[in-house]
Amino acid sequence: MINKIIAATLVSGTLFSFSQCAYAETPAILVKELPSNQSFTGLTFIPNAQVQNYGSFGFDFAHGLPLRNNVSDIESLTFSLGLIEGLEAQGRIVTEDYSSNGFVVGSIRDLSASFKYQLPFFQDFNKFKLAVGVQDLGGELNYFNTNYIVADYSFDFAPIRMSVGYGQSDIPLGVMDGPFGGVEYQPFNFIQLVGEYDSEEFNSSVKILTPKELLPYDITASLSYQVYSGHGTDTKNVWNAAFSIPLISDYTRSVSFSQNDMSLRDKLFVEQKKFQDASISTLVSALKNEGFVNVQVGLVNGRVVVALENRRYNHNQADGLGVALGIVSSHLGQNAAQDIGAASDQFELVMLANQKPVVSVLSDSNCYQSFVNGSASCDDIQFITRDLPERLDMVDWKTERVNSGTLDSQIVFSPMVRHGVATEYGVYDYSFAMSSNLYTYLWSGAAIDVRHILPLAESDDFEEGGYFEDSVYENEIERAMVHQFFRLPYVDIANQVSLGLVKSDYIGARSESAWFSQSGNHWLGLEMSYFQHQDEKDKNGYANPDRQTFLTRYTFSMPEWDWQFNATAGEFWKGDVGAKFTTSHWFEDIEVSASYQVTKFNDTDEEQFVTVSVKLPLTPWRDMSPRVIQVRGNEAYDFNVTTRVGNDYNYLAAGQGDELVMDNSMLRRYFNRGRYGQEYFEQNRQRIRNAYLRYLGTRLN
């Protein structure tokens, strides 16, 4: 005990004396929040009250964790996210090795979730923070379950942060099972020294981190190494390596986006000056040259109407809308208006999807130009998402449709993976493939959709004789369908009917219906489908059952929070009946969601699962210009992990809560992945404006 006290005193004394010297030279340094060797932001084994920044994604690899009765030579892979302001969420895989069979060897392999919330009551006190958290929440086998409360204070006299807290932990070693505390000191912007008492022993570590702006895209990286521990780890290396990257940039919300880019400001001045002399033909040519299809210009009530379709800006239809609005406002002046008999430079831009109207914007050129160049605000911008077919019927078209996209095709390439994560068979088992999806536009609202799967690689457990052999990808046509989209008159309900082959072997039909409120904050959906297997019996002689779904959906959207909640209930693909609840947070065009589902088959008990999913674009912001063939990537690649909850054991299970997910669903092709409605576009005015500036910057480069 005396040795521990002496060691702790030396650590504390070193930290303090070092701080007095270095702070005089670098008074502006702030103590950076960094990951710990547990599943939270903190020191070595204890947390502080700091949380990951909102919209920041992090990954860290750690060696040496408190497990059972000692600090073990095990490793963890932790993925973290600043989910909302003040809340960090972490998913962690803990393992002793990466490929052994846990049923044979008996080694630990654990998948868990953790959360820490910084209480908002002390926002006016920048130096003092208070947080509560839970590590290893839920699940059936909890090796690291810990609940805690922690406060920290950052001093003015030196770059020092002190933390104290209290925890209740199931870790037999006693880490965080009682009072704990620690000190972090950052003498320079690239080094941090920490000392802590973890409720059981004293520890100290050195952390090296990259200074701000050293790495591109605001990436930060750090390396931590434990230099002392009372847990008797002299023969063990306890360390972690981490990086983090912000998922949100100035592009979507900043008023001053590209304000200091003088070459871009000059280009904007030149473009906006064109509206004085431009004609309708030059406007149409400008839109055509940027890759917009189905371009047509007309009049209604003395106002110019421009209809067009975006197939180039696939991350978000708001980007295509912004580029089109910028081009129209830069070319539609008095001269162009007089070309077709318009009374003023007021205009209506109607955005189409496969020749079907999805959103309309009303503005005028002078006002919108001021909004884009930042010289003045523009209140004359109105978004409309209801009764659009009726509005188009009133237009007196003055030009023929230019750059028709009929019979044009898109080939969308996307990686595919079926996997087992942190199972008893391995940390990560996989079957990798590449899909090529041919989507050909026919008449209005109609398309052909064919997807081929090409296997690339698989782990040994997906090979013949392995546990997952039945789930390995095969070289085949996996989907071949015809889609037809239409709207029901008067009630403004959107529908898409799909006929053909799905999941390689099933032939049948699917119907999707959706109703959006004017604001877009609420939408109701209904899915019905019926499919029959091509073969009456499987390879083992058992009958292949028919598949049918009947699912009702409700989604509540809050664009100001970039958040959605969805409830789905009914009969799922495999015949199980129940409900699924999903919360989704958007970080620009990356969707992070967590789902809880509870379903049952007729002759079984209810089963509960939690799924974490990340959908992200794997295609450039500005794709190749649409032609007869357009090649691009997947705008919403889905990577997800599922685990069982609410049961004594976390055995592997597949199929429950399974849905008929299609890349070309109505929601993705026509309604911007559910980011839709008047309120959504109003909240994203700044992004719509900045899209045109980004487009000009792309042309300059």
Describe the role of every protein-language-model region.
Residues 1-23, 583:
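Gram-negative bacterial Sec-dependent N-terminal signal peptides
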Residues 24-142, 154-158, 206-208, 228-238, ...:
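Transmembrane beta-barrel domains of Gram-negative outer membranes and organellar outer membranes
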Residues 25-35, 41-42, 49, 190, ...:
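Flexible, glycine-rich linker and terminal segments associated
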Residues 50, 74-86, 108-124, 130-132, ...:
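Feature captures outer-membrane beta-barrel proteins of Gram-negative bacteria and organelles
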Residues 56-66, 87-97, 127-138, 151, ...:
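Transmembrane beta-strand segments that form the barrel wall of outer-membrane beta-barrel proteins
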Residues 57-61, 302-310:
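Short, aliphatic-rich beta-strand segments
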Residues 65-69, 97-101, 121-123, 138-140, ...:
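Gram-negative outer-membrane beta-barrel proteins
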